[in-house]
């Protein structure tokens, strides 16, 4: 298959990253996306290895710790024709990268962010990540965690993400469908993927999740899609309320979707009508060693007396 690679994979046996990788690969293939136009971006952590496991011509970009969203934003705005998928751990995206995570929601760039959510920093021996609940003590910690946890779903919705979902790494078929929906969505999409870390997190295990997870689309009255502006507040409230459900039952599926909000690309075009026809990736910036882009007139135009 076009997305798969024979590259040897050194994740721990049973790691949820295998399911996430598999779901991403299947989603890309089933959507029939031109693989030359797919870019997979990651930060640092166990999830950071994901770009290495996609076959060329899919492009992979392994970036700095916490900066995957920033890199991906630049890639997408330079060439809006690309399908850009960000992968990052809960520590990478919600710890050092939290500022970029929130700022991205205000822009609504048309790309997908996949959050690998296992409650620990798996690459550095299992320290508590921003999504580990206060008071929990996985085997990697000498004492219970004293910090409160971030709620990725609520944070994404309140920041402005227009597609917000939660998946489960061991339900690859369901996760694949969420990723396909996120790619097709026009705007910024987050998928918070619950994934067991069999090496360091002995609380949120496969057995623990299997007894609790249920799908939102099995609820008869669940409809996360905003169809008119008057519905926004109601849909947001329901989504955030449902995101707080954690314990005996944990919902997965689409929490919120709103395509009435213009993407960042559309907002740029409103100011620069030629943007989508003449994107930065198509522009010649130098010829025979000399710059062809002269910004002096642009700066002059924006001078303030």
Swiss-Prot record:
Its EC number is 1.2.7.11. One of its GO terms (cellular component) is cytoplasm. Thiamine diphosphate binds at residues 44-47, 65, 91-92, 122-123. The record marks 125 as: Plays an important role in the binding of CoA. Mg(2+) binds at residues 90, 118, 120. It holds the Pfam family TPP_enzyme_C. It comes from the Archaea. Its main location: cytoplasm. One of its GO terms (molecular function) is pyruvate synthase activity. Heterodimer composed of an alpha and a beta subunit. It is found in: Cytoplasm. This is 2-oxoacid:ferredoxin oxidoreductase subunit beta. Keywords: 4Fe-4S, Cytoplasm, Iron, Iron-sulfur, Magnesium, Metal-binding, Oxidoreductase, Thiamine pyrophosphate. [4Fe-4S] cluster binds at residues 12, 15, 46, 197. Catalyzes the coenzyme A-dependent oxidative decarboxylation of different 2-oxoacids such as 2-oxoglutarate, pyruvate and 2-oxobutyrate to form their CoA derivatives. It is an enzyme of class 1 (oxidoreductase). Its cofactor is [4Fe-4S] cluster; thiamine diphosphate; Mg(2+). It catalyses: a 2-oxocarboxylate + 2 oxidized [2Fe-2S]-[ferredoxin] + CoA = an acyl-CoA + 2 reduced [2Fe-2S]-[ferredoxin] + CO2 + H(+). It comes from Sulfolobus sp. Gene3D superfamilies: 3.40.50.970. Binds 1 [4Fe-4S] cluster per subunit. Binds 1 thiamine pyrophosphate per subunit. Optimum pH is 8.5. Changing residue 123 to N: Strong decrease of the oxidoreductase activity with pyruvate and 2-oxobutyrate. However, this mutant shows almost the same activity with 2-oxoglutarate as the wild-type. The keyword Protein transport does not apply.
